[in-house]
Amino acid sequence: MAGKTLYDKLWDSHLVKQRDDGSALIYIDRHIIHEVTSPQAFEGLRLAGRKPWRIDANIATPDHNVPTTPERKGGIEAIADQVSRLQVQTLDDNCDEYGIVEFKMNDVRQGIVHVIGPEQGATLPGMTVVCGDSHTSTHGAFGALAHGIGTSEVEHVLATQCLVAKKMKNMLVRVEGTLPFGVTAKDIVLAVIGKIGTAGGNGHAIEFAGSAIRELSVEGRMTICNMSIEAGARVGLVAADEKTVAYVKGRPFAPKDAEWDLAVEAWKDLVSDADAKFDTVVELDAAQIKPQVSWGTSPEMVLAVDQNVPDPAKEMDLVKRDSIVRALKYMGLSANQAITDIQLDRVFIGSCTNSRIEDLRAAAVIAKGRKVASTIKQAIVVPGSGLVKAQAESEGLDKIFLEAGFEWREPGCSMCLAMNPDRLESGEHCASTSNRNFEGRQGAGGRTHLVSPAMAAAAAVSGRFVDVRELI
């Protein structure tokens, strides 16, 4: 019998029923809830006279709409936007009504859903994990089958603890070799997207493997899996190993005592078999990857920091040529312009991609002893959770950022998306550690450039993009 991929094993172990139409019913182990995609789901339960099927499989926190400034200490009433305030209050009310564990806005455990799940040990190897957010793929870094779902599916999972889904194809992205000094997980995943495009992973679950992936920390792997959706794949996976086990051990939701020993033994099988067959294989040489910067309005529009913006006149494909022309116009850039000549207005270090303690440490190394350039209007650092914030402060990272001229904020999704007060003005260029650079993503007319935390910090102190390796 042919070997199985990691994705195959996870799928098969959660398959409840295969349906005649090609879809299947799978069991969901963990459901993470936030304020934006859950109100209608809870109301649907209420109207149908149902209750959540398994209370302890759910955890919740507000993140998308919460302000990151100190005023939020005043509670929900401090949220200025009426819709945002209502969504956060509704999440609190729904979780209180049904007894669902929620880390409310001013709880130290509050944070971005894809930070607090792993941080609490609520994400474990071998699990199925869903959330009403497309970057749920983040949790695949633990050898878990994780992906985003829509609001109607949120209701379905709440009511039944199951989900109707179709099995995906298998893609292997193998990154072998040693990363050059100063090159990070964010650079790997941007390079992958640049290679295969934003549709490259459509219909696939991507397993990231190879020596360069194994060398990454668990937090680095989360960054990789987080952006699998930007490569077109709803699911990103990294096989569980000793790093995974060490990260999870002792966390609040992790198994204890004898159950822990049994779990660790079971997790050893969460790898693709040596003879497993993948539908698509993509290979990258880690040694060839440089610090990356997105220049356009799609994550696939990405280049190494030492390259120039493309010239549409040199593009033979008419569709691609038109997209380059449109992106250049929106971004206010010129053909053949050097990436290092792009002048910046704001810098954002945060998001579910890059707001964990290792990300903040990497940025602080660059910020230490330097000052934010006078041409930068604002540079903000937004920890991914209250616990990340507390850890960073215990290490003195907040002081490094503040002394350099950065703003040190409360946890939340912040400037990743224009659903809270942190946003760009039209025409502003932002070096951002987030995951999407679509038109208007960070604010109407805002121009987003995706980079690693270290590259963002380097841009902040330089006023433009520079090769971070020159500052280390």
From Swiss-Prot:
Coiled coil: none
An annotated GO BP: L-leucine biosynthetic process
Amino acids binding [4Fe-4S] cluster: 352, 413, 416
Keywords assigned: 4Fe-4S, Amino-acid biosynthesis, Branched-chain amino acid biosynthesis, Iron, Iron-sulfur, Leucine biosynthesis, Lyase, Metal-binding
Entries under InterPro entries matching the protein: 3-IsopropMal_deHydase_lsu (IPR004430), Acnase/IPM_dHydase_lsu_aba_1/3 (IPR015931), Acoase/IPM_deHydtase_lsu_aba (IPR001030), Aconitase_4Fe-4S_BS (IPR018136), Aconitase_4Fe-4S_dom (IPR036008), IPM_dehydratase_rel_enz (IPR050067), IPMI_cat (IPR033941)
Subunit structure and binding partners: Heterodimer of LeuC and LeuD.
Protein name in the entry: 3-isopropylmalate dehydratase large subunit
